[in-house]
Amino acid sequence: MANIIGTISNDTLLGTSSADTINGKAGNDIITAKLGNDTLTGGGGNDKFVYNLGDGIDTITDFGGVGKGTNPTPGVIAEVDTIKFQGSGLTARNLLLTQNGTNLEITFEGVNDTKIVLNNFKLEDLDNLKASGTRPAIANIIFDGQTSIIDSFNVLDANSTETTIGIKNTVTFLNDLANNIIGLNNSDDVINGQGGNDKIDGLSGNDLLRGGTGNDTLIGGLGDDTLIGNADNDSLVGGAGNDSVVGGAGNDTLNGGSGNDFLNVDSSSGNNLLDGGNGNDTLSALGDYYGEVVSGNNTLKGGAGNDFLIADYSTGNNLLDGGDGNDELSVSGDYYSAVVSGNNTLKGGIGDDTLKAIFVTGDNLLDGGAGNDYFWLNIADGNNTLIGGAGNDTLRTGINTGNNLLSGGDGNDSLTASGVEGYRFDNNSGNNTLNGGLGDDTLKVDYSRGANLLNGDDGNDYLSGSGYTYGYGGAYYITTGNNTLNGGSGKDTLNVDYSEGDNLLNGGDGDDYLTASGYEFDEDYEVYYQTLGDNTLNGGAGNDTLSVDYSQGSNLLNGGAGDDALYGVYSTGDNFLNGGDGFYNLLYVAYSSGNNTLAGGASYNDFVIDYSTGNNLVSGSNGIDYFSAIACFGNNTLNGGAGNDYFDISYSSGNNLVNGGDGNDIFNTFGATGKNTLNGGNGNDTLTGGSGDDSLTGGAGIDTFAFNSFNQGIDRISDFNATNEIIQVSAVGFGGGLSAGVLQTSQLRIGTSANTSTQRFIYNSTTGALFFDQDGNAGGFAQVEFARLSAGLSLTNENFVVV
């Protein structure tokens, strides 16, 4: 810190980098204060104060102004002082003059650490005057790069009644009254409103208009204009051209007009209206990364053109309307700083728009309007609504906790409410509703913990509430909520694979594919994950495929109208498969371990429970049904119902109950080792026992009891009718020289054993035992009982047929 005092002569005084006090005294002095907040006194004479960019806050105690008017007296001229600014940005266009009480503060727009305070000085006393007659030019301020007055500026005094500026391409400072002033055509005017409620019209040219304090109206006119409202409630109209329009702290109205405009009310607390007009505009009501938020309720209207509308770091309830064109709309915060807490409305309008809401806590509405729009809602806590509108839209939400509504509208849309962000997996816990609307839509709530509702509506839609497993024994990213998926009309795919919830899937009209499956193999090809919930799958009208493969839950599958295929392969739960109406149905639960119930439709059904270990109940209906329970371990019940049915329980080991019902049924138990019960029911049935001791009842009708070999257990035939029913034997399986056709008379013996070498079948009418002897009474083969009939039957060779 230095105290520097000049002489009464013309001194050149240089300060230090500290806060100095410099007094030039009399004479025409040149004072350069340098860094630090300095106090400067020129003394008498025409003094020049040299100020460099970033020198700090300097105070001049006795600055001599030009004064009012354009003809200062010789006495005034003798005391006029000059400030010489040096440094980038220290120009007349950037000059800002602020009357703060009795002092005038000089700063520059966009320049930091640069300020001069003129003590006891009025704004109207500051001016630059060009030479006039015999009077030379006199200047209070010379700007960077100048040696004389080039960029002049003009200050209207407090009594001025001017309605227009007088000089083209100049800088004008108004007084603190309510001024109504216009610029000049074809002139790049800079007009500063200062205080008062001013109306400033730049006319044509690239103008810079500043409102200052007060409720101002700024009109840019034709040209690329810059309008700055500053404090209070301002109306800013850019007009034609590419304009920059900046509001302030009040409730401002900004209109860009035609052209590619930039409208800005960043960090404002007011309720502002921004209207871009025609052109590709940028509208900003932006807070900042460091926590300074926009707190007002702002309205941003893009108008025609490809516009960018942003209200990030905002706490107000904002409306962003893109209008026509391909627009981008954003109301977002960030992870480290602020979140958007208001209830915002984003409307894309006509065009291919992008709508974003990230790190938001309010209940927001995002409406894309017509066009192929893209929506991104992430890290959201509120209950948000996303509406795609007409067009092929993409609606995507990420890690959210609210109950969101996503509606695709017309077009082929993609709707996703999944809890996954890049390579970071997390869950979406809200209860979301996704409506596809018209078109072929994709709806997903993968990795979700909420109870979601998905409606495909019209079109061939894909609906998914699935989870994910990662690698051999890796992480599970599972959907846990109880979701409802409605396909609607069309050929739809509904998927809740890798889910832990109890889901409801409704295919609706059309040929649909519904699945609640889930499996993943480890490195030894062992299944280590299955779907866990108790799911309900309803195919609806159409030829549908329903699958709960690799499921641990007890699932209900209803085929509905149409020819359906229902699967529960490798499932462990107790599933119910109902084929429903249709001409043909396939019900397939092979390799399952649960106790499943399979109910066919009215016509043709195929039932497959092969290689299952549970005790299954399978019921046909009135049609022609096929039952396959090959190599099963459980005790199954198979009911054919009306119709000509075929039952195959070959190689099964359980004790099965098979009821043919009405119709001409065929029973095959080849290689089955359990004690099976076969009931033919009404109709002409063919019953074949297995390797175990089976119970065969033909029921009403003319039945055939078939035997493939004599050494496959002793089967009990409870109701054999000797007048018209047949015992069918295999020539290959029995041997003994049997020939195809009706058994020869000599090959049947009624008694306890054979008494000739030609006799092969011996019926003990006292006990009902039926034996086979390959060589009759030759003695080389001991007779084997292979069936037990009722006693006292009048059997003849006509009751036996060899095949």
Residue ranges and their predicted role:
Residues 10-93, 187-748:
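Acidic, glycine-rich calcium-binding repeat modules characteristic of RTX/beta-roll
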Residues 73-75, 96, 718-720, 753, ...:
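A general structural signal for short secondary-structure junctions and capping/turn motifs
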Residues 181-183:
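LRR N-terminal entry segment and analogous cap-like coil->beta motifs
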Residues 93-99, 103:
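Short boundary segments that mark the start of a structured unit
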Residues 1-2, 102-175, 179, 751-803:
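Low-complexity acidic/polar repeat-biased segments
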